[in-house]
Amino acid sequence: MFCIQCEQTIQTPAVKGCSFAQGMCGKTAEVSDLQDVLVYSLQGVSYWATQAHRYGIINDEINQWAPKAFFSTLTNVNFDPERILQLTSQAAQFKAQLKDQVLTASSLANSPLSEVPAVAEFELPENAQAILAFAPQVAVNRGKEGVHEDVIGLRLLCLYGLKGAAAYMEHARVLEQTNNDIYAEYHEIMAWLGTDPEDLGELLDCSMRIGLMNYKVMEMLDHGETATFGHPVPTAVNVKPVKGKCILVSGHDLHDLEKILQQTEGKGINVYTNGEMLPAHGYPELNKYPHLVGNYGSAWQNQQKEFANFPGAIVMTSNCLLNPNVGQYADRLFTRSIVGWPGVAHIEDDDFSAVIESALAQPGFQHDEIEHMITVGFGRNALMNAAPAVIDQVKQGNIKHFFLVGGCDGDKAERSYYTDFTEAAPEDTLILTLACGKFRFNKNTFGDINGIPRLLDVGQCNDAYSAIQLALALAQEFDCGINELPLTLVLSWFEQKAIVILLTLFALGVKGIYTGPTAPAFLTPNLIAIIQEKFDMRSIGNVQDDLNTILAA
């Protein structure tokens, strides 16, 4: 195996990347190698989908399936080799289908194809053993002996960024938001990456193209969520258990949460959100269910202890999944969509009766704990409605600076920086937060500035779109560029969704972003220097020194 896509990958002076029997995330070498073959197969699908598009052939099923399959290879999503093999086999079938259609259309149009790349002609070996034997030829760092390490680094930046965008495309699709222009662009980029490009300038341009495409995807996802569940409104959420039978819903999929809420009505089961599902409480069409009683737990890296202590059924709707056997709760864990773990029950459709049965068989919480309320729901609409009051406080000098502190959480001790940063931020500053990084400080008390809460929970990682809209509105009001605002982004990364959001911000021209806790292992020192120079990206350091630098600017 060779995998270097997440923040926790092995980084030593001698080794970069996971290349042993098991990755740091827990996936086996077998699963990692199978995922490499799946990605290569999907690049072949995208080549033929791109050619088909040129002949006016648009296959909605393949367009919507391909990003979903790519999503399955994102960190902490699918650890099940059988499921990965099924997706790879499906990719081979779709590729053959598109190829036949393209060759027929090409013949009818008397316009033969130019040279077809190897990724498009690849034939999937007949069995798992042969597929695994072939896998080293399509490793994500293939060809490293013949090109500069910067080329490999930028290829991976593009591949991982596109993977993050594919995840958001799937989240949008679940809410019936699709766009053939976006699918066409996705296929073009995916196919091009399958040809192993070597031009650094073209690769850097491609990363910006991915960022801009993802902005459109986040806009589409925002529309899907708000059209389906209403615009989020500031809402108090209890983060302590309530007596009764219970189901815990983790991941990002609001659609699944709604189905679970509908199917548990009147059954005496309380439903809790976990991790990135916390923002669900702000959506009126979800919060209207009285048995959506609160949020349980914290960020993904703590789930093995927290899930073990949860006395009910658990549903993983998307990333991030850890080995459930460690906490011995695999028998009451259920996976959905692209999530998988060997031996764990998987729900193929919207029927959650098995989850309900499991929840009723568990003891549930035996007593109410004293309430602890936090506030969520500062989505795009709420932020825009609050903008006049915020602008007034800025003009009066009561708000001196805005910070967006958020992103992915993780295990490393250096991540305490983000807690320390929010606690050290002066009282005349506002802090926006999003994604699971917020759990390092979202239960703390920050007070308010003349009625405006100092901590504003914007939502999930994809709700960076909402924060961008607020920044654009402020820039318009103050007649300045976005980089001239008293606004600083302090972001933490872990996996590929965070990578594509960073690319989106870069593509929109946002500069001076602080990132951490460490640089991606797939980026060489030279590439990091290029990105720092081009986008004024900063690495987090000492909290007080960073604050002094920011506020003195």
Swiss-Prot record:
The modification Cysteine persulfide is found at C408. Its cofactor is [2Fe-2S] cluster; hybrid [4Fe-2O-2S] cluster. Keywords: 2Fe-2S, Cytoplasm, Iron, Iron-sulfur, Metal-binding, Oxidoreductase. Binds 1 [2Fe-2S] cluster. Binds 1 hybrid [4Fe-2O-2S] cluster. InterPro entries: HCP/CODH, Hydroxylam_reduct, Prismane-like_a/b-sand, Prismane-like_sf, Prismane_a-bundle. One of its GO terms (molecular function) is 2 iron, 2 sulfur cluster binding. Its EC number is 1.7.99.1. Its main location: cytoplasm. It is found in: Cytoplasm. Hybrid [4Fe-2O-2S] cluster binds at H252, E276, C320, C408, C436, C461, E495, K497. One of its GO terms (biological process) is response to hydrogen peroxide. It comes from the Bacteria. GO terms for cellular component: cytoplasm. It catalyses: A + NH4(+) + H2O = hydroxylamine + AH2 + H(+). [2Fe-2S] cluster binds at C3, C6, C18, C25. Belongs to the HCP family. PANTHER family: HYDROXYLAMINE REDUCTASE. Catalyzes the reduction of hydroxylamine to form NH(3) and H(2)O. HAMAP family: Hydroxylam_reduct. This is Hydroxylamine reductase.
